[in-house]
Swiss-Prot record:
Residues 13-71 form the Tudor-knot domain. It comes from Homo sapiens. Residues 114-166, 298-409 are annotated as: Disordered. The keyword Nucleus applies. Residues 150-166 have a biased composition (Basic and acidic residues). Component of the MSL histone acetyltransferase complex at least composed of the KAT8/MOF, MSL1/hampin, MSL2 and MSL3. Interacts (via the MRG domain) with MSL1 and KAT8/MOF. GO terms for biological process: positive regulation of DNA-templated transcription; regulation of DNA-templated transcription. Residues 168-517 form the MRG domain. Transmembrane segments: none annotated. This is MSL complex subunit 3.
Length: 521
């Protein structure tokens, strides 16, 4: 129903007003606001009443609310004094509940109190309010009664709405190491200037990288934990805080983080992580015709052979881990990215524009089908796997645990910790991010099985924006960002293994031919 059908409105569209907090569970305060729209609504008894669409100054448009006429006041000096009085009461009430001043949790209150005249006192507020109109007096009495009740009870807030408000005001930053920033620039240069593509499927895919990181993280956490009992040797036996694990040492949180990265990557890759020149390649490698299902008998035979021979802890049979070197193309080696390249810093964006089709692939230029073979020599293993193998030998056939005992004997409080820690490490070393039967043989594998570190790194450019649209408590967000930081350090430490220049090839050689599709385990 429109606003021009005879009903008289006290306020009009576009007028600057003061409006009460629309949520009855929150503190009774007045906000600076503006009327966006006016309509005729109905109350609970079906009577026609005016309703106003209110925009609160400084708030996101998503917080615009419809309010009844009795929730809106004119922008006058008297109502401004009432606004300041309610703001002071609300802040005092929050302080009395033990909340920090910097976390006032009342948007708009700080700006109201900043404009408070120094000579204005509570007594003057009472005197000025007593001379107001009858309508204002009635409102003042109701507000005073409600304020008195609120002062005796703790302010209750809806956690979900409060978290959303805080997230809108929070800026999330993920620091990317310098060596990885340069990798992002080189990646942009190779794709957009040199018209190269990352050869797919990657030799070390994202599943392998994430699983390797969890094992790397767990091993480092366990070895650093060995020193902890020495410093807490004098703690009393009854103290149960010895079981506390900091977020940056928590393996379960690390597993949740990498699983979240996997899910986020699979979803966002086609939306925001591909350059326009890569769109056609993505459609090809994710088609059902590109990958052929593996025969169950061949798979079981291959895995049984792998189980009989010792292997590094991070070479997981469930993920593609080819040891074939990149095929030579006959072209000169790809040069380094030129400096001061203006297009090398362009941002990632989604585009429906397809890149130009490759020239026809000849049989001689088609990449051979890589075969899974066992890592029987250290020369075929990346530096990361060699490093972890030397640091933590895994005796899969031996019942003796990994030696994790500190040099000094600990107290009885920590006597049972070593066995538990050893079991946890052995469990983590056999842990897999996805089950063996995923993805099903009749379905194309998800992007995390095909793409590698080059595209995973791009995700961290977009993560602050993605996280800004999610609801996290301050504590959980801080822990998550800490784990992101540790993971980026891991990528930076082994960037020579994860980001080889040979990964970028000509567009016509950027994927295996459909005649010889690459096996996905």
């Amino acid at each position: 129903m429109s606003a021009s059908e005879g009903m008289k409105f006290k306020f009009h569209s576009g007028e600057k007003v003061l409006c009460f907090e629309p949520d009855p569970t929150k503190a009774r305060v007045l906000y600076d606001a503006k009327i966006v729209d006016v309509i005729v609504g109905k109350d609970e008894k079906g009577r026609k009443i005016p309703e106003y669409l209110i925009h609160f100054n400084g708030w996101n448009r998503s917080w615009d609310r419809w309010a009844a006429e009795d929730h809106v006041l004119r922008d006058t000096d008297e109502n401004r004094r009432l606004q300041r009085k309610l703001a002071r009461k609300a802040v005092a009430r929050l302080r009395s509940t033990g909340r920090k001043k910097k976390r006032c949790r009342l948007p708009g209150v700080d700006s109201v109190l900043k404009g408070l005249p120094t000579e204005e006192k509570d007594e003057n507020d009472e005197n000025s309010l007593s001379s107001s109109s009858d309508c204002s007096e009635n409102k003042d009495e109701e507000i005073s009664e409600e304020s008195d009740i609120e002062e005796k009870t703790e302010v209750k807030e809806e956690p979900e709405l409060q978290t959303r408000r805080e997230m809108e005001e929070r800026t999330i930053t993920i620091e990317i190491p310098e060596v990885l920033k340069k990798q992002l620039e080189d990646d942009c240069y190779y794709i957009n200037r040199r018209k190269r593509l990352v050869k797919l499927p990657c030799q070390t895919n994202i599943i392998t990288i994430l699983e390797s990181y969890v094992k790397h993280f767990a091993i480092n956490a366990a070895f650093s934990a060995n020193e902890r009992p020495r410093h807490h040797h004098v703690m009393p036996h009854a103290n149960m805080n010895v079981h506390y694990i900091p977020a940056e040492k928590n393996v379960d949180l690390c597993k949740e983080m990498v699983d979240g990265l996997r899910i986020t990557f699979d979803y966002t890759l086609p939306l925001v992580l591909l350059y326009p020149y890569e769109q056609a390649q993505y459609k090809k490698v994710t088609s059902s015709k590109f990958f052929l299902p593996i025969k169950e008998s061949a798979t079981s035979t291959n895995r049984s052979q792998e189980e009989l021979s010792p292997s590094p802890p991070l070479l997981n049979p469930s993920t593609p881990q080819s040891t074939e070197s990149q095929p030579t193309t006959g072209e000169p080696a790809t040069p380094k990215r030129r400096k001061a390249e203006p297009e090398a810093l362009q941002s990632l964006r989604r585009s429906t524009r397809h890149s130009a089709n490759c020239d026809r692939l000849s049989e001689s230029s088609a990449s051979p089908q890589p075969k899974r073979r066992q890592q029987d020599t250290s020369a075929s293993m990346p530096k990361l796997f060699l490093h972890l193998e030397k640091k933590t030998p895994v005796h899969s056939r031996s019942s003796s645990p990994i030696p994790l005992t500190p040099s000094k004997e600990g107290s009885a409080v920590f006597a049972g910790f070593e066995g538990r820690r050893t079991n946890e490490i052995n469990e983590v070393l056999s842990w897999k991010l996805v089950p063996d039967n995923y993805p099903p043989g009749d379905q194309p594998p998800p992007p995390s099985y095909i793409y590698g570190a080059q595209h995973l790194l791009r995700l961290f450019v977009k993560l602050p924006e993605i996280l800004g649209k999610m609801s996290f408590s301050e504590k959980n967000l801080k822990a998550l960002l800490k784990h992101f930081d540790l993971f980026l350090r891991f990528l930076a430490e082994y960037h020579d293994d994860f980001f080889p220049e040979s990964a970028y090839v000509a567009a016509c050689e950027a994927h295996y031919s459909t005649k010889n599709p690459r096996a996905i385990y």
